[in-house]
């Protein structure tokens, strides 16, 4: 018996030693061995996984690129981050590398949603959007009246509520009126869902402990179930919105588009269609109130285009406002940096001067590329004028702009987001003075979408005289 035990232990020890040797060989002699990065990243993805779970990677990666004086980083044995714009363009446009395998279950959803994001369809959503913005303005009016003509508004959460209502009103069967109720229950559940998703992506076994997810995000799950049940119980003609497109896809192919897939897609829509847009608008306001001269230029353009307080601000009237568009582009460049553009090499390729082998996850790091001083003069400064013409010898080129990803896999909802951002900002600065509340933290955390570490961002709001 002891002999058999000795043999088994010997086999196990040999296997452990074999695997250790393979790890060492891959770390020091493999194709990625010359790519700069933290020492531990040669052997394990654990340090990077911890950053993702904590949501701090948004803040720590930039300094790592500076520390190693490189435009490519090895942050796990088979994963690299790429920060130079030509290589990013090669990854997502020229070579159009396939998505990382972890996104396999989300394949083909673009085809389902295509009609739901066509320009004609989006134009038809304007009355629903405007109705939500009317409620937003009523909230501001009420708060200012309570404060004697001035109010401090938590724009991070208020705009999050607004974007949530817009998404539900236009795409999911009806608004939940969070803008007026300020009920944080669903938003807290959504935040927990995003954190849980980050944790599950690094500790996959948690996906098989269903009671954990059900307990933490029960409010979110109940909301999705309510949306589905309500629509399926309707009789007569139903709206041809995104919800119906998803349900129709399930009817056409219940195997590929299963009941579980319906729920996953709805949750994805809620996140992508509300949290990303609201944070983009909040960041734009943050930059404007911290740069009052730029804010004055925007107000001047809005006043010129809409001289009367009764002028209606619409999709068509805002799409060609040059300074408004420049403000949004610049705010997105500085603060909206997608961190889920992972691609996968299916053959050897050269990125940032290094040979990258097949079966490597390559992740474009847009934040560093969009603040590269070689491309963007005064790279970390808020300069909307760079989008209006030459600035300090350089012209802003949209091929270096990645806030909506790029190539064949760019963000399908970007035109929805552009319409929403233009209307919110246009209507807000048309009727209200917005001002800086000093002493606030700008530090953020990221779990799929970003949020302020302090949990809020306050802006002073005051009705404009004559408006």
How should these model regions be labeled?
Residues 1-4, 452-467:
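C-terminal helix/juxtamembrane-tail motif
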Residues 2-108, 123, 127-142, 162, ...:
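N-terminal membrane-proximal hinge/A-helix region immediately C-terminal to the signal-anchor transmembrane segment
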Residues 32-36, 53-55, 119-123, 233-236, ...:
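Conserved, non-catalytic sequence blocks in retroelement Pol enzymes and Pol-derived host proteins
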Residues 40, 130, 149, 185-189, ...:
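Cytochrome P450 I-helix active-site segment
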Residues 99-108, 124-281:
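Cytochrome P450 heme-thiolate monooxygenase catalytic core
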Residues 176, 292-294, 414-452:
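Cytochrome P450 heme-binding "Cys pocket" and the immediately downstream C-terminal segment
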Residues 364-392:
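Conserved cytochrome P450 K-helix/beta-meander segment immediately N-terminal to the heme-binding cysteine loop
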């Amino acid at each position: 018996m002891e002999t058999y035990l000795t043999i088994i232990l010997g086999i196990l020890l040999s296997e452990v030693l074999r695997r250790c040797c393979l790890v060492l060989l891959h770390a020091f002699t493999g194709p990625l061995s010359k790519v700069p990065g933290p020492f531990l990243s040669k052997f394990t993805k654990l340090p990077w996984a911890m950053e993702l779970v904590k949501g701090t990677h948004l803040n720590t990666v930039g300094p790592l690129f500076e520390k190693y004086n490189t435009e490519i980083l090895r942050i796990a044995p088979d994963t690299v981050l790429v920060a130079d714009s030509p290589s990013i363009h090669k990854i997502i446009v020229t070579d159009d590398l396939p998505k990382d395998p972890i996104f396999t279950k989300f394949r083909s959803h673009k085809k389902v949603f295509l009609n739901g994001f066509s320009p004609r369809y989006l134009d038809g959503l304007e009355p629903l959007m405007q109705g939500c913005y009317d409620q937003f303005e009523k909230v501001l009016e009420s708060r200012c009246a309570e404060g004697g003509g001035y109010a401090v508004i938590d724009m991070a959460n208020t705009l999050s509520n607004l974007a949530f209502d817009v998404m539900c009103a236009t795409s999911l069967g009806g608004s939940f009126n969070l803008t007026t109720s300020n009920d944080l229950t669903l938003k807290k559940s959504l935040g927990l869902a995003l954190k849980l998703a980050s944790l599950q992506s690094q500790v996959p076994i948690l996906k098989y402990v269903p009671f954990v997810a059900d307990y933490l995000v029960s409010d979110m799950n109940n909301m999705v179930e309510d949306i589905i049940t309500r629509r399926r119980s309707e009789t007569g003609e139903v709206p041809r919105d995104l919800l119906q497109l998803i349900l129709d896809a399930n009817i056409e192919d219940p195997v590929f588009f299963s009941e579980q897939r319906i729920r996953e897609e709805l949750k994805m829509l809620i996140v992508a269609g509300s949290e990303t847009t609201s944070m983009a608008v909040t960041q734009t306001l943050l930059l404007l109130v911290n740069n009052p001269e730029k804010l004055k230029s925007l107000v001047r353009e809005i006043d010129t285009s809409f001289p009367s307080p009764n002028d209606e601000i619409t999709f068509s009237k805002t799409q060609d406002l040059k300074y408004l568009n420049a403000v949004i582009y610049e705010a997105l460049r500085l603060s909206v940096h997608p961190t889920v553009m992972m691609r996968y090499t299916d053959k050897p390729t050269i990125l940032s001067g290094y040979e990258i082998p097949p079966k490597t996850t390559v992740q474009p790091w847009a934040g560093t590329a969009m603040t590269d001083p070689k491309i963007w003069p005064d790279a970390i400064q808020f300069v909307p004028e760079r989008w209006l013409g030459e600035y300090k010898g350089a012209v802003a080129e949209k091929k270096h702009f990645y806030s909506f990803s790029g190539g064949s896999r760019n963000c399908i909802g970007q035109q929805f987001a552009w319409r929403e951002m233009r209307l919110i900002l246009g209507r807000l600065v048309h009727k209200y003075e917005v001002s800086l509340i000093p002493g606030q933290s700008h530090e953020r955390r990221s779990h799929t979408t970003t949020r302020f570490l302090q949990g809020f961002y306050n802006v002073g709001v005051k009705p404009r005289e004559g408006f």
